[in-house]
């Protein structure tokens, strides 16, 4: 029996198979002559349907991927998120456009977590430049603008935002069918087809990353603690905003124990300003006027 792969429409395939079967006698005689054998067995042609099965499987997989993309985000726990990180080897990390301290600090926190896990192929993309205040964070040099050609990766990790479209140009690097893990503390349903930890009880995405270190059983390095402390203090306003809770202070204590230089970091984040910022502040103060016995101030 000879199995042959046939291409074309159904009628074309039938016609090809009929032609092969009609030529079976000639093929048999030619084989006998060329191989110089006394007896040549009967030759029967049959269609090889394995390719059809492959094509069918491809269609099934395409349907599954499409259903996954349209499915609501799958909420998972921190332990499962840690297992997801361990199970991948190549990563794409990103956050929202116009990144703040929580966005950059959380992204770098995940970067240091992956490095501590022994992962080496990590791409960090942010659509906008890293603000000057955060360019000296440990690992910030790993952050780049989106590549024209999406890199190969197994898992995308999106921090401090729950929807890919808010990552700007990085969204073009987030390939369909690739796994996506979201770590966010804002209320929302999250990216369809992704999985994630979204918990608004955390004051900052950086706090979720701290909890992820614990779930993964990985100690927080001084470098990671620095980044995550910046993430926390920027989103809590130095622990002055109403989102600050008892857990926030416990997390802060954990980061301090990991080696954070709190006074130095707070000075750099809250008290150091650029020359243009200083000039703007000077202009605002120069034009300030007081009303209502000094209880109201306005400027222009």
Language-model region placement:
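Active-site cofactor/cluster-binding pocket
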Residues: 140-195
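Short, polar loop motifs at secondary-structure junctions
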Residues: 32, 127-130, 183-188
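Short, hinge-like loop/turn segments at secondary-structure boundaries
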Residues: 61-62, 111, 139-143, 198-201
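Short glycine/serine/threonine-rich phosphate/pyrophosphate-binding segments
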Residues: 101-107, 164-168
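Short beta-strand segments
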Residues: 94, 157-160, 182-184, 231-233, ...
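Charge-rich, low-complexity N-terminal segments
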Residues: 1, 5-72
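Hydrophobic helix-and-loop "lid/oligomerization" segment in the mid-to-C-terminal part
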Residues: 75-97, 105-135, 149-153, 234-300
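Short alpha-helices
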Residues: 183-251
């Amino acid at each position: 029996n000879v199995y042959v792969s046939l291409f074309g429409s159904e009628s074309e395939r039938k016609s090809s198979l009929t032609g092969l079967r009609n030529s079976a006698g000639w093929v048999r005689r030619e084989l006998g002559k060329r191989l110089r054998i006394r007896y040549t067995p009967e030759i029967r042609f049959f269609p090889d349907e394995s390719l059809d099965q492959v094509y069918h499987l491809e269609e099934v997989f395409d349907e599954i991927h499409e259903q996954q993309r349209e499915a609501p985000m799958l909420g998972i726990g921190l332990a499962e998120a840690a297992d997801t990180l361990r199970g991948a080897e190549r990563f794409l990390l990103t956050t929202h456009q116009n990144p703040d301290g929580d966005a950059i600090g959380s992204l770098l926190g995940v970067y240091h977590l992956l490095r501590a896990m022994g992962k080496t192929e990590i791409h960090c993309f942010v659509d906008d430049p890293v603000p000057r205040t955060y360019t000296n964070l440990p690992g910030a040099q790993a952050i780049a603008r989106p590549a024209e050609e999406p890199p190969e990766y197994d898992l995308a990790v999106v921090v401090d935002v729950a929807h890919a479209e808010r990552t700007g140009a990085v969204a073009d690097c987030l390939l369909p069918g690739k796994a996506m893990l979201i770590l966010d503390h804002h209320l929302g349903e999250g990216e369809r087809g992704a999985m994630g930890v979204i918990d608004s009880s955390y004051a900052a995405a950086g706090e979720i990353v701290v909890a992820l270190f614990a779930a993964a059983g990985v100690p927080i390095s001084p470098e990671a603690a620095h980044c995550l402390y910046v993430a926390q203090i920027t989103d809590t306003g130095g622990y002055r905003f109403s989102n600050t809770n008892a857990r926030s202070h416990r997390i802060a204590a954990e980061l301090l124990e990991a080696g954070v230089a709190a006074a130095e970091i707070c000075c750099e984040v809250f008290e150091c300003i650029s020359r243009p910022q200083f000039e703007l502040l000077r202009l605002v103060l120069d034009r300030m006027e007081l009303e209502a016995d000094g209880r109201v101030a306005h400027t222009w």
